[in-house]
């Protein structure tokens, strides 16, 4: 246990715990569970205080560590962790300056916003019992009590939890992690059973006379004497307590806590129906680039100039024709829209000076494709509230779709390496403070593993498209602006390269609210024949626009070039998140860092170099019907990045719901694997909540399928 504590906790916390045990004459070599408990309590106190400040207006605010906070006052004064003399000096000073009542026992924190001392409790038992013990010991209504447990429960005075939900969730997650780490090392049972209650006067002395009578009178209802109450508390069974409480709430509620065994869970039911379709804002694995190397043309860097230069590299244009019509659209309009783009680009080239931006003529085909004048007129509610049959639009339930193999292929492709470099070394960004050697080393290793990854190309493509579209939406609200879809990269030899994927034409964009929609038509080059997987391209009209000569093992071959055209829409908030897709790099880097930290704590030294350079070692990547898939550390980096990127590309309410609900089932299964004997009630309700998120979204359906593979292998 001592080794675990030294690996698991910050050295400063370990040092403070050692001092505290020395001060109370306890041997940490013998009292190892107490050592762990003190460290945990210290860490919770520090996490409680972290990032919370009071601004100049006296309001409580949360500030992340990288923000400048020189003018801000810390919201909490930390008393726990100081030696007794210093701690009492701090308490006395607070009482003198704020007029707060001096507590009988040393509290853990002082809250300058609520002007109260706080006692933090961390328990391995039931929060209600521990709360009662704390309250009994302190006997002061002025000190606020906040109890956390290792199972994610909490209890606070008058249900006032002081902190925002996210800050408390950080603490609960950390406690859950400590518990899991202990369980995996076989230390949890001993630690859980070693907790002694708060020592109070009542426990040390036999109570007689008047005090005894008062104790008997002040018991909760249904208890005749103190002995009965003590016997009840000693034999308290939390599961039964929850059942009882629920049955009191309503006659309909009958929650029996059922043991969760290996045979309990069933697979998640995936919907039946036609196969799901591609719904990303731009093509992924099927996209085709027209590229120029070492661009040095006039106006290089201006999107329209770059686009025209890229278009000139291709000579195989031909009369376009529809090869896969859109089921519900007016397909000739899509064809005319592409012809209009070609014609207007031709017009630009004949001008003396190419303009920086191009607004398309408002032709009938573009008006149709962009939904111009299609939105129903908005009427003020007061003008029509007297209409008897006033009602909202009838909206059809979305049609259920089944999982299709193309989305797994898309994901596999996103994990692959390309022959281009998509991010520079500093793309993730330097730290403001002098960066530690280990942190920069990790970042450089990680960047090297993902810089060639196709998921990284999707990030840069997404950032560019969303930035360009948001800029155009604000700068040219009434215009049908032509926006080239461009990305920049380097070849393996380090030469710069500019790529054109196609074009977007933006519709009217008077975006007042974050969720107001701007319509756009996307036109993207591809070599994929849509007739191979027509269900994937349900929302597209696909044209054949040229023939491309490709080098192959047998010489040059000619392949038809297609243009995937569709009407789409997005909003300010979606574009804002799209512009920030680089965050995916950071998220996956942090996940890799936590793997390195876990390895380093076991080996008691930094394992960054070995982690990335030991090419013989394989790591678990994910579950498939075959079992646990393993791969190199580079493959792990790229898989984690691809997951993060797909979460961004396919963000939806279905994904939010599925992630939140399936996580609950995941935690229960993890608890079972850790031999924590979990119990559940209304497991059917949890499955219902998970399955109502499985409607038609390809990424959610794929995640559900992966979850089923995990269930199969986790419970063998």
UniProtKB/Swiss-Prot annotation:
Keyword Transit peptide set for record: no
Enzyme class label: hydrolase
Short motif Nuclear localization signal 1 (NLS1), span: 124-139
Protein residues bound to Mn(2+) 1: 41, 108, 119-120
Motif mapping: Nuclear localization signal 2 (NLS2): 184-247
Amino acids binding Mn(2+) 2: 80, 108
GO biological-process terms attached to the record: cap snatching; DNA-templated transcription; symbiont-mediated degradation of host mRNA; symbiont-mediated suppression of host gene expression; symbiont-mediated suppression of host mRNA transcription via inhibition of RNA polymerase II activity; viral RNA genome replication; viral translational frameshifting
EC number: 3.1.-.-
GO cellular component: host cell cytoplasm; host cell nucleus
InterPro entries documented for this protein: INFV_PA, PA/PA-X, PA/PA-X_sf
Record-linked Pfam families: Flu_PA
Binding note for cofactor: Binds 2 manganese ions per subunit.
Subunit details: Influenza RNA polymerase is composed of three subunits: PB1, PB2 and PA. Interacts (via C-terminus) with PB1 (via N-terminus).
Family: Belongs to the influenza viruses PA family.
Task of the protein: Plays an essential role in viral RNA transcription and replication by forming the heterotrimeric polymerase complex together with PB1 and PB2 subunits. The complex transcribes viral mRNAs by using a unique mechanism called cap-snatching. It consists in the hijacking and cleavage of host capped pre-mRNAs. These short capped RNAs are then used as primers for viral mRNAs. The PB2 subunit is responsible for the binding of the 5' cap of cellular pre-mRNAs which are subsequently cleaved after 10-13 nucleotides by the PA subunit that carries the endonuclease activity.
Protein name: Polymerase acidic protein
The organism of origin for this protein: Influenza A virus (strain A/USA:Memphis/10/1996 H1N1)
């Amino acid at each position: 246990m001592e080794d675990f504590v030294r690996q698991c906790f910050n050295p400063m916390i370990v040092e403070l715990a050692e001092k505290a045990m020395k001060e109370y004459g306890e041997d940490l070599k013998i009292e190892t569970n107490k050592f762990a408990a003190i460290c945990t309590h210290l860490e919770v106190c520090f996490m409680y205080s972290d990032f919370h400040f009071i601004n100049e207006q006296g309001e409580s605010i949360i500030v992340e560590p990288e923000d400048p906070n020189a003018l801000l006052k810390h919201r909490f004064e930390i008393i726990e962790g100081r030696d007794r003399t210093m701690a009492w000096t701090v308490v006395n000073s607070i009482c003198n300056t704020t007029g707060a009542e001096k507590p009988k026992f040393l509290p853990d924190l002082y809250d300058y916003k609520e002007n109260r001392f706080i006692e933090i409790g961390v328990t391995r038992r039931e929060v209600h019992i521990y709360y009662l013990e704390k309250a009994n010991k302190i006997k002061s209504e002025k000190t606020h009590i906040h109890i956390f447990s290792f199972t994610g429960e909490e209890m606070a005075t008058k249900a006032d939890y002081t902190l925002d939900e996210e800050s408390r969730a950080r603490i609960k997650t950390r406690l859950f992690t400590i518990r899991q780490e202990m369980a995996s090392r076989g230390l949890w049972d001993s630690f859980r059973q070693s907790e002694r209650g708060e020592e109070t006067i009542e426990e040390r002395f036999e109570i007689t006379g008047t005090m005894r009578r008062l104790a008997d009178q002040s018991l909760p209802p249904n208890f005749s004497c103190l002995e009965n109450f003590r016997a009840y508390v000693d034999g308290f069974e939390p599961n039964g307590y929850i059942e009882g409480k629920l049955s009191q709430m309503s006659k309909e509620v009958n929650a029996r806590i059922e043991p969760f065994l290996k045979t309990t869970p069933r697979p998640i039911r995936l919907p039946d129906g036609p196969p799901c379709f591609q719904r990303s804002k731009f093509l992924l694995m099927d996209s085709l680039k027209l590229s120029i190397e070492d661009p040095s043309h006039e106006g290089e860097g201006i999107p329209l100039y770059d686009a025209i230069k890229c278009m000139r590299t291709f000579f195989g244009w031909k009369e376009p024709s529809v090869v896969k019509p859109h089921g519900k659209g007016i397909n000739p309009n899509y064809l005319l829209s592409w012809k209009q783009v070609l014609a207007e680009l031709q017009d630009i080239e004949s001008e003396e000076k190419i303009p920086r931006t191009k607004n398309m003529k408002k032709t009938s085909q573009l008006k149709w494709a962009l939904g111009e004048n299609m939105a129903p007129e908005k009427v003020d509610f007061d003008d029509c509230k007297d209409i008897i049959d006033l009602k909202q639009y009838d909206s059809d339930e979305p049609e259920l779709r089944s999982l299709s193999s193309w989305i797994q292929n898309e994901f596999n492709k996103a994990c692959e390496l390309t022959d281009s470099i998509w991010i520079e070394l500093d793309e993730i960004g330097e730290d403001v403070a002098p960066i530690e050697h280990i942190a920069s080393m990790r970042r450089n290793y990680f960047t090297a593993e993902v810089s060639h990854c196709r998921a990284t190309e999707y990030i840069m493509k997404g950032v560019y498209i969303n930035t360009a579209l948001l800029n155009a939406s604000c700068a040219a609200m009434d215009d049908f602006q032509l926006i080239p879809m461009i990305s920049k990269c380097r070849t393996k030899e380090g030469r710069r390269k500019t790529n054109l994927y196609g074009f977007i034409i933006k519709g009217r964009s008077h975006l007042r609210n974050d969720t107001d929609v701007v319509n756009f038509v996307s036109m993207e080059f591809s070599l994929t024949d849509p007739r191979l997987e027509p269900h994937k391209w349900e929302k597209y009209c696909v044209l054949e626009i040229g023939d491309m000569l490709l080098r192959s093992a047998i010489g040059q071959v000619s392949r038809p070039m297609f243009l995937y055209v569709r009407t789409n829409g997005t909003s300010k908030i979606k574009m804002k998140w799209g512009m920030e897709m680089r965050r995916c790099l950071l998220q996956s880097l942090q996940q890799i860092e936590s793997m390195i930290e876990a390895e380093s704590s076991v080996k008691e030294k930094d394992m960054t170099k070995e982690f990335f350079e030991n090419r013989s070692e394989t790591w678990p990547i994910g579950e498939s019907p075959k079992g646990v898939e393993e791969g190199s550390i580079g493959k792990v980096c790229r898989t984690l990045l691809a997951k993060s990127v797909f979460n961004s590309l396919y963000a939806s309410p279905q994904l939010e719901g599925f992630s939140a609900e399936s996580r609950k089932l995941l935690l229960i299964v993890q608890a079972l694997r850790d031999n924590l004997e979990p119990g559940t009630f209304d497991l059917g309700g949890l499955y219902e909540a998970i399955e109502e998120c499985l409607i038609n979204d390809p990424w959610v359906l794929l995640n559900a399928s992966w979850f089923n593979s995990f269930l199969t292998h986790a419970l063998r």
